[in-house]
């Protein structure tokens, strides 16, 4: 499960954080929007505990403030809340810069909000 939190006191332009665990460690994603979008930054930690301690120090976020959300679906971007993927990634022909999101079971190309 991923974890997400909106900051009550934004730090610079950062207003939302997400934590995601995989085989390499724990990623912390930072966002400048509260709507579902790609992150502004990512940082890799050895463990979820290390990432959460960093968030408490840097952003004042306590462990109980995080909300769990499902992990991304296969071939989907880890930093988006809803299923979003790079077009063609699922068949080994990624078209970087082109994104698709799943709407009512269909993958639809869209332009990301920047």
Features from the language model and the residues they span:
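Short, hydrophobic/aromatic-rich segments at coil-to-beta transitions
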Residues: 1-6
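Short aromatic-glycine-(Arg/Gly/Cys) micro-motifs in beta-strand/loop hairpins
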Residues: 13-39
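Short amphipathic beta-strand/extended segments with alternating polar/hydrophobic composition
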Residues: 18, 38-48, 112
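A C-terminal-region feature
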Residues: 26-30, 35-36, 50, 58, ...
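A short, charged, amphipathic alpha-helix used as a generic interaction element across diverse proteins
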Residues: 41, 45-62
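Short, mixed-charge low-complexity intrinsically disordered segments
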Residues: 61-114
